[in-house]
Amino acid sequence: MESAKRVLVYLTKENSLLQCAKFAQGITGHYSANNGDKAFIHCGLEKNQFVISDCQFLGSARVQLQRPSFCPIKNLSPRQSASLPQEIQGRGVDVGVAVLVQSINKKVLLTRRSKSLNIFPNVWVPPGGHVELGEQLLEAGLRELQEETGLRLQEVSWSMLGLWESAFPPLLSRGLPSRHHIVTYLLVQTNETHQQMQERLCPDEREVSACVWLDTEIAKHIVAAEDSGSPCGPLPASISVLELIHGSLSQSDRSMATFLNSAPKEGEDIERISTGTKYALSLWLDGMPTNSSPCA
């Protein structure tokens, strides 16, 4: 079976027996009051199973789990759920890992997914992917980082920022879900500046079409626009990005508006920062020292 080759999500609540999460099961709603969109949970990787629990267990981390209000899994009707193909219903819930690399000068790296990818094409996300059997979360994240960007990090410190429940397509208006993930966002801090790491960037053009380093001020605008519908204070007109053109990185300017886009409710997707990435940026900012920024 395909599921035997993947690390899947397993659930336990109120000391119940550990069970493999079902594809059409809302994970966040399972642990939140009144089927809400956020919950604090305990989680950890055990024997190739990603365990989520409402109780602490050996080696677990306590973090926030969240999903968007428009989550397709949450909004599936019983009839829609029953109409899912059997191979989809039997998939379970996959585990993804995404690495928010922070330089010593407080910038984080995002990559734009290639337009040729089937899932979330042309969307800005941190480097990441699936956890393979036998891997630990950090090990999987650093492997994906190297495969996608060419960056190989040696001495790092890290922590788990939070979990995000993700489905694709991201809205029911674009079709029934065919993928369901719990994405584990890891903050990986290095002792290098972003310029030092940028010199070693060598993205795989099959997966990545551009890279950008975001500082805290830009991140605050992005998060504020997602939360309130408008950025906090004056905005730069553009952001400098590194576009991958014919195998080489070239610096160019990208409109700031692109990074404030939200997922359209209907029609084709657009270039934007993924909703889960905005959530991860908000958690990153929450952990930063308070300053006098107008967005603080």
Curated annotation (Swiss-Prot):
The entry's keywords: Hydrolase, Magnesium, Manganese, Metal-binding
EC number: 3.6.1.62
Residues the record lists as binding Mg(2+): E144, E148
Name of the protein: m7GpppN-mRNA hydrolase NUDT17
PANTHER family, alphabetized: NUCLEOSIDE DIPHOSPHATE-LINKED MOIETY X MOTIF 17, NUDIX HYDROLASE, NUDC SUBFAMILY
GO BP terms in the entry: NAD catabolic process; NADH metabolic process; NADP catabolic process
Chain ranges for the short sequence motif Nudix box as given in the UniProt record: 129-150
Function: Acts as a decapping enzyme capable of hydrolyzing monomethylated capped RNAs (in vitro). Hydrolyzes monomethylated capped RNA after alpha and beta phosphates to form N(7)-methyl-GDP. Shows low activity towards unmethylated capped RNA.
GO molecular-function terms, A-Z: metal ion binding; NADH pyrophosphatase activity
Cofactor(s) this protein cannot do without: Mg(2+); Mn(2+)
A cellular-component GO term for this protein: cytosol
Residue span, Nudix hydrolase domain: 90-236
PROSITE patterns found in the cross-reference section: NUDIX
Family: Belongs to the Nudix hydrolase family.
Catalysed reaction, written as an equation: a 5'-end (N(7)-methyl 5'-triphosphoguanosine)-ribonucleoside in mRNA + H2O = N(7)-methyl-GDP + a 5'-end phospho-ribonucleoside in mRNA + 2 H(+)
